[in-house]
C-alpha cells in the first residue's frame, strides 16, 4: 500500500515556528484570514504517491507573503491574475505568486524572513530571498508588468496576483508535481476546496475579471465561478513557463496582445 501523507503532519501550521496572524487593515486582513481558512481546510487532506513532500509557503514564508498582501491589496480589484500553485524557485522561496527573487526584492520591494519548511527536500532547499536560482516564469511575468507599468503601484491599482492553490508538491526524487499529476480523487478534493476559496476571495476583492495564467488555472476558475458567480468574466493568458514552446517565442509580445484584446492596457498604463 502506498503511504498516505497527511498534510497537517508533514507541515504543521507554523505553531512552533510562528503562528500566522493577519495584519490589521480591513481588506488585506480579510484576504489573509481567507488564506488561513484555506490552509486549515487543506491541512485535513491526505496525499499518497506520487507525493513525497508538501511545501506551504503561505506558512513558512508568512512574513513576506503578509507584506505582499498588506502592501498591494489595500482596496478592491477589478482584475485578478490567477496562477495555479507555487513553483520551487518562485513562491516557494519568497511567498509571493510568480515570486522570482530579484523581482520580489527589487521591484515589488517585498522583504521578510523565510523560515525552513518542517520537512525539506535536500534537492529543493528553501533559501528565501537568498535563493540564487531565478524562476523564469516569474521573471517573465513580473518583468513584463514592470516594463509596462513602470511602478508596481500602477499595476496593483486595479489588479492583484494570486494562486489558486498555495501548496507545492514534490515527488520523493524532488521533482515538482503539478496538481494535474495528483491521483484523480486527491486532486479533485484539493481543487474543490481551492475553488470554493477562490469564490470567496473574488467576492471579497470585488473582482470583475479573472485572468487564468495557463490553461489549467483558467479552466479551474471557469469551473469554480460559473455556478456561484456567473457575472465574473474568466479569460486566459498564455503561461510564461519555459516548458511552454509558445512562451519561448516571445511571451511578452503575446501577453501584450492578449491584454489589449481584453481591454486591460488602459488600466495598466495609468
UniProtKB/Swiss-Prot annotation:
SUPFAM superfamilies, sorted: Uracil-DNA glycosylase-like
Gene3D superfamilies registered for this protein in UniProt: Uracil-DNA glycosylase-like domain
The protein's enzyme class: hydrolase
Domain of life: Eukaryota
UniProt keywords, alphabetically: DNA damage, DNA repair, DNA-binding, Hydrolase, Nucleus
GO biological process: one example: depyrimidination
A cellular component term, taken from the record's GO annotations: cytosol
EC number: 3.2.2.-
Residue numbers binding substrate: 84, 98, 163, 239
Effect the entry attributes to changing residue 85 to A: Markedly impaired damage-excising activity for U/G, hoU/G, hmU/A and fU/A. No cytosine-excising activity for C/G, C/A, C/T and C/C
GO terms assigned for molecular function: DNA binding; DNA N-glycosylase activity; identical protein binding; oxidized pyrimidine nucleobase lesion DNA N-glycosylase activity; single-strand selective uracil DNA N-glycosylase activity; uracil DNA N-glycosylase activity
DNA-binding as annotated region, ranges: 173-187
Subcellular location(s) of the protein: Nucleus
Pfam family, one: UDG
PANTHER family listed in its UniProt record: SINGLE-STRAND SELECTIVE MONOFUNCTIONAL URACIL DNA GLYCOSYLASE
Family named by the database record: Belongs to the uracil-DNA glycosylase (UDG) superfamily. SMUG1 family.
Function recorded in the entry: Recognizes base lesions in the genome and initiates base excision DNA repair. Acts as a monofunctional DNA glycosylase specific for uracil (U) residues in DNA with a preference for single-stranded DNA substrates. The activity is greater toward mismatches (U/G) compared to matches (U/A). Excises uracil (U), 5-formyluracil (fU) and uracil derivatives bearing an oxidized group at C5 [5-hydroxyuracil (hoU) and 5-hydroxymethyluracil (hmU)] in ssDNA and dsDNA, but not analogous cytosine derivatives (5-hydroxycytosine and 5-formylcytosine), nor other oxidized bases.
Protein name: Single-strand selective monofunctional uracil DNA glycosylase
Taxonomic path: Eukaryota, Metazoa, Chordata, Craniata, Vertebrata
Recorded name of the encoding gene: SMUG1
